[in-house]
Amino acid sequence: DMARWMGMDPAEKKDIAWNASSKRFMQGWYDKVLRPMERDGIDFWWLDWQQWDNDKEFPRLSNVWWINYTTFTDMERHHDTRPMLYHRWGGLGNHRYQIGFSGDAIISWKSLDFQPYYNSTASNVLYGYWSHDIGGHMGADSINPEMYIRWMQFGAFSPILRTHSTKNAGLNKEPWVFADKERDIIRDIIKQRYSLAPYIYTMARHAYDTGVSLCRPMYYDYPDAQEAYTNRNEYMFGDNYLVYPITQPMNNGVSLQKVWLPAGNDWYELTSGTMLKGGQTVERRFLLDEYPIYVKAGSIIPQYGDVKNLRRNDEAVTVTVYPGNADAEFVMYEDNGNDKQYATAYASTLLSATHSSEGTLRVSIGARKGEYSGMPAHRQYRLKLVASAVPEKVVVDGKQTDFEYDGNNLSLMVDIPETDCSKAKTIEVVYAKDAPVLTDGLIGK
């Protein structure tokens, strides 16, 4: 079909020269080659240097830049869903179209060590959606489980999490090819990533509206601190998480990591349950299933529970509140997830937490504002208070209710009956006046 479209005889089996600057060639490529496969169920395309650097007729036209643009806009014209494609960096301004992938990464600690810096500083040219070959692509015939787990931990707090490698049976990365302990760690990393989807999606909307990427260097948030420029591999993951991936092998089963914690607020260490003061550099120890993730004190994070996929947006949402003395809020964003009306058709829910001098924490789940196609009318919520003492009582909309307390993880859970999303919910957690805040690193102890 493509040969006939180009005025050639298919029986001659002649090559058709790539010519991205030819409107006829590109129209034929999309309509005769790609479109039939899209009708068979292909949702997005991964383009990968199937052409030379620059166009033959217009030498100053970058083939990568141009094909990213033409593929994105072709999908935009011919599909009801949002365009999506993977391709390489095409130059300044090309961030508008493709999700980038950073090439065939060498399997080495050195390669892993470079990626966090590379990932976050790309935000300086608005290139906020890098994806990487998690675990590395080539340069080895077998997987180092420790290195792969550290790479996965970084990947879970990257814009895109995907594993990839060259065709080599020794480099298979399915969780079940690992030993039980390693498999369980990998599974928990993936589940953690899924659980953060409401938070990540909200921050993705922020990036769309402001140009500030999900992953960005520390100097975006702390421009006056010298440490924000010298800690190259440390970055913010959205507004609430500070991440410093481990990129070196353990010594005697432990990784030592120095982490700079900016002044202005305290930081809750996710793996240990320790609250650390801001304005200092700390050296912390981490086992293989632990890594440096810090949450701003008092943060509210919307999360999913144990979801299997992200096809639906009506999943139960856990409102996780981290310890902190200041009042806090988070505006959770939602839209259809796949249609093209997201610019104007979306909804938001204000989540807030306020403290009273009498020892009561009041958490509010606001009435949802806005609307979009497929929006669920009702939703199940769960409140999770991290580092919480056992309360005297919990009251939901004026009625005392049951709660669960996890003594191992020092957390309080309150299940809220399925609620009309157009109506606000208020949860009051009443503590004794001398109730402690359990941020001394005893989680799991």
Identify what each model region corresponds to.
Residues 269-288, 393-415:
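Solvent-exposed beta-strand/loop surfaces of large extracellular or lumenal domains
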Residues 236-237, 355-358, 405:
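Generic beta-strand structural signal
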Residues 293, 297-399, 416-423, 431-445:
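Accessory, solvent-exposed terminal regions and/or long lumenal/extracellular loops of proteins
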